[in-house]
Amino acid sequence: LIPSDPVLDRVLENNHRAGLPAHDVAANQGQFLALLVRLTQAKRILEIGTLGGYSTIWMARELPADGQLLTLEADAHHAQVARENLQLAGVDQRVTLREGPALQSLE
């Protein structure tokens, strides 16, 4: 039902190769997140827990040009993989990734 997306497929492969846990949302859940961003006309998004950036990419793609997504990731390895994936997907300019415990990152 959801067409294959070569970039998102590669992101999932990158996550697997990097040894990240397989906790990514399913494609239909990612599409639903994207729909929520579009319907609410969100300009700012806060995501707590980035993992490899898969859901981040789904949401960031739907942001307007002046939109911004802030995502928080406690694990340094996960954050590095996510940074690479965000760049691969071309959304790194709309996403700010803060590494460290979420409560400290929000201060």
Positions of predicted regions on the chain:
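S-adenosylmethionine/decaboxylated-SAM
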Residues: 20-107
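Rossmann-like AdoMet
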Residues: 1-25
